[in-house]
Amino acid sequence: DILVINPLYALWETDLSDHLFAAAAHTGKTELSNNVNRIRLKTDHDYYNSGVLLMNLKKGRVMIRREEIFAFVAEHGSELFLPDQDVLNALYGSEVLALDDAIWNYDARNYRNYLLRSGGVRDMKWVMQQTSILHFCGRAKPWKHGYKYRFGLLYQHYVQLTKRFLPDHKECISL
């Protein structure tokens, strides 16, 4: 549920150093949900979105233990709202290098929040020039009937381009 609209070179070149992941937190204009998730998961760091992750595979092979994940889910299963994201944050959130969500994991539902937080700087032109990854977070998706958010037309534009330039794959693409 992501749409890449600008190059990913800078993300690819990101030095993870000792971090396990690089990810973005969707803090919103009040950071309320971020703080609720900190309390809920008993963490002292931002709540990172798992939709776009840059992974340090070498470190992950050493640090990530299946048993630890299964034990956490067994103990907290009824408390997990977004299980993959909750596990990432609870067990490994302190190992995350924070990315700018407006560039690397732009929540397509929240255009007005980004505009407000930036004092009007991060407008539609800015998004089209600076954002690399649009993320269609939540249940509403631009390929589903009734999608009402701002970036639905952009998604449809890319679907049309894909159909035009990859005609042999039309059956894999929906509007």
Cite the ranges covered by each PLM segment.
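A recurrent flexible, glycine/aromatic-enriched loop bordering the glycosyltransferase active site
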Residues: 41-52
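A short, conserved beta-to-alpha structural element at the edge of catalytic cores
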Residues: 18-41, 145-151
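A glycosyltransferase accessory/donor-loop signature
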Residues: 55-175
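Short, surface-exposed, charged loop/turn segments at secondary-structure junctions
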Residues: 12, 37-41, 67-72
